[in-house]
Amino acid sequence: VSVLELFRLDGRVVIVTGASSGLGVSFAQGFAEAGADLVLGARRVEKMADTAALVAAAGRRVHTRKTDVVDPEQCQQLVDAAMAEFGRVDVLINNAGVGTAVPATRETAEEFRAVVDVNLNGAYWMAQACGRVMKPGSCIINIASVLGLTTAGLPQAAYSASKAGVIGMTRDLAQQWSGRKGIRVNALAPGFFVTEMTDELRPGYLDSQLPRIVLGRLGDAAELAATAVWLASPAGGYVTGQTIVVDGGLTIT
């Protein structure tokens, strides 16, 4: 087998949550270009339809379902829909996420719980549902963040705690499932990428962070999608329990 062939995902079925915008769109498009069929979940159905159109344009099959990952039943229903449509789930991209920037002394219990419910609890419910049906050779990729490893000048305790939790959960699920079930579990920890979420940050914030990024620029979403394709493909077959940092060198400064 040639090295390039190891990066192909022909015939694989990939679930992407948070597929209506931002990195989720790039993940869906990237996996479609690598040969996979897609099952998309998101709360914003109209925007998710645009993502589905990109998958179809790449010549791949696609199924969409409105999904709020804070609800374990909706997570199970998304996986059930994938099984009904395609008969298998090979890859989960646990991408659904929200963020806030609220000083710790002013953050309400509702604000804190809302972030953790999506970013950590929702990722767990999706992994749990997929873990029930995945066969050996399957893969889960949890989307964490460099803010689970470091700080970046904004008051984001809830977001940072949730993403640090994702990193810990990734290691434990890998320990539980990789040997016994043959399911690899890894995380990606992105730095700053050009997405809708970064567009919503306060004016001047990203400019203030650029000096910390060794490569001197924000990431392109396609670069993160390519990393996910590698990690999910046979090329990444000897990697499990790891958090792959994709941040342009932010965390080494």
Where does each model-flagged region fall?
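Residue(s) in the substrate-gating loop at a strand-loop-helix junction
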Residues: S145
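Alpha-helical segment proximal to the catalytic Tyr-Lys
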Residues: R132, Q175-G179, G237
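Short C-terminal tail/terminal secondary-structure segment
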Residues: S2-L6, T150, A228-V229, T240-T253
